[in-house]
Amino acid sequence: MSFRPLHDRVVVKRLEGEEKTKGGIIIPDTAKEKPQEGEIIAVGPGGRDDSGKLTPLDVKAGDKVLFGKWSGTEVKIDGQDLLIMKESDILGVVA
């Protein structure tokens, strides 16, 4: 990837949602909700505390994470639809 996030920002690729319901009904693209789960693609170096010391992020590339429905900024990088968000927008890491 030709993009490196700064500070406490991360780049996330959304994981696609289900194509069918449990009952077998196919969900059209227009009715699908945006997935709130994604994979971390790249992370910034971290934020700075009050004394100016660098604080590394708790997440790393490859982590699967949950985030809020309206979190982040949607961007297209190298032909991929991605999100750029602050680490604080991430709700947690999926084990």
Swiss-Prot record:
Family matches, as InterPro entries: Chaperonin_GroES (IPR020818), Chaperonin_GroES_sf (IPR037124), Chaprnonin_Cpn10_CS (IPR018369), GroES-like_sf (IPR011032)
Location(s) in or outside the cell: Cytoplasm
One Gene Ontology term of the molecular function aspect: metal ion binding
Main location: cytoplasm
UniProt keyword Cytoplasm, yes or no: yes
Disulfide bond annotation, renumbered to this chain: none
GO BP field: chaperone cofactor-dependent protein refolding
Coiled coil: none
Keyword set, alphabetical order: Chaperone, Cytoplasm
Membership in a protein family: Belongs to the GroES chaperonin family.
Free-text function comment from the UniProt entry: Together with the chaperonin GroEL, plays an essential role in assisting protein folding. The GroEL-GroES system forms a nano-cage that allows encapsulation of the non-native substrate proteins and provides a physical environment optimized to promote and accelerate protein folding. GroES binds to the apical surface of the GroEL ring, thereby capping the opening of the GroEL channel.
Protein name from the UniProt record: Co-chaperonin GroES
Species of origin: Methylocella silvestris (strain DSM 15510 / CIP 108128 / LMG 27833 / NCIMB 13906 / BL2)
Gene: groES
